[in-house]
Regions:
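Cys-nucleophile CN-hydrolase/nitrilase-fold catalytic domain and related Cys-dependent amidase chemistry
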Residues: 33, 42-123, 197-218
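Short, glycine-anchored, charge-dense loop/turn motifs used at functional sites
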Residues: 22, 119-127, 242-250
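Active-site catalytic loop in hydrolytic enzyme cores
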Residues: 76, 108-185, 198-207, 270-277
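Short beta->alpha transition motifs characteristic of CBS
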Residues: 63, 69, 118, 129-136, ...
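Beta-strand-turn-beta hairpins that frame and shape the catalytic cleft
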Residues: 13-22, 159-168, 189
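Short beta-strand scaffold segments in enzyme catalytic cores
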Residues: 100-102, 116-119, 158-160, 239-241, ...
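CN hydrolase (nitrilase-like) catalytic-core segments centered on the catalytic cysteine
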Residues: 78-99, 166, 172-259
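N-terminal, active-site-proximal structural segment of metallo-dependent hydrolase catalytic domains
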Residues: 2-54, 60, 64
Length: 285
């Protein structure tokens, strides 16, 4: 499969002084879209009231069904549907950029959807969409996951020019593939909305997030599902924000809530000047 790159450009004004508050939402979503949207609205308000200008929801925030096929039934066409209407209206109402960790978007393949990360600006406009490229598969004891049975993989690396710098979009299992982030170029912020299992999360989650931040000298915001779900699945949680030096700025081990921190682009630039690792890269073929 050929992977392409795309950058979405925004006309928004850059944030003054290079400092902005960013927030991640942690949830334990269930099979009711209405209930999940209500919880997301509550948590987005908390983040906005604390001064966040960018709020990122976890993977599958709108539906964690009893069966994998539940998300296929809940899939929407791009540009319409209750989930997207909620995201647009809430971004405008709260005057924040909202990144919908992922929602199911209809595909051309019967019985399958795209697992799509949708980015809305503070006017409620959809400015970018990323379809998850790497589909999770696990066969470990009693745990078996095969996302490819209901999801069509994406084929584009997506970045967004925003008031908060250049943002790279990814979802959950993508975190294990550093070449994806290298393909983004020099981004200021990587987003990794996730639903890591408890098994893989407790073993690898923090290590992977901090590694991506350090090797790319950028901020990483990783909001996650955290708790027990109607399917019997347990997700790891531990949503976190990590700075370009690998320091964890905020984290939430379990349950619903918000992580929030200030992103300082001047600090990031100083680190990249002191340790110019990005300019020292050698690309091997």
């Amino acid at each position: 499969m050929a992977i392409k790159s795309r950058t979405n450009h925004s006309k928004a004004t850059p944030t003054a002084a290079g400092i902005v508050k960013i927030a991640g939402i942690q949830m334990a979503s269930g099979p009711s879209v209405a209930a999940n949207l209500s919880e997301a609205e509550r948590l987005i308000k908390i983040a906005a009231d604390q001064g966040a200008k960018l709020v990122v929801l976890p993977e599958y925030f709108a539906i964690m069904g009893v069966k994998d096929t539940d998300k296929v039934k809940a899939a929407e066409q791009e540009g319409s549907g209750q989930i997207q209407q909620f995201l647009s209206a809430t971004a405008k109402k709260r005057d924040v950029w909202i990144v919908a960790g992922s929602i199911p978007i209809q595909s051309e393949t019967k019985g399958k959807v795209y697992n799509a990360c949708m980015v809305y600006d503070n006017k409620g406009k959809l400015v970018a969409r990323y379809n998850k490229i790497h589909l999770f598969g696990l066969n470990l004891g009693n745990e078996k996951y095969h996302e490819e049975s209901t999801i069509v993989p994406g084929n584009q690396v997506v970045t967004v020019d925003s008031p908060f710098g250049k943002i790279g979009l990814s979802i959950c299992y993508d975190l294990r593939f550093p070449e994806l982030y290298r393909a983004m170029g020099n981004v200021d912020l990587i987003l990794v909305p996730s639903a890591f299992t408890e098994t893989t999360g407790k073993a690898h989650w923090e290590t992977l997030i901090r590694a991506r931040a350090i090797e790319n000298l950028c901020y990483v915001l990783a909001p996650a599902q955290g708790g027990y779900h109607a399917s019997g699945r347990e997700t790891h949680g531990d949503s976190m924000i990590v700075d370009p030096w690998g320091v964890v700025l905020d984290r939430l081990p379990r349950g619903s809530g918000v992580v929030i921190a200030s992103m300082n682009l001047d600090y990031q630039a100083s680190l990249r000047k002191s340790l110019p690792a990005l300019t020292h890269r050698t690309v091997f073929k």
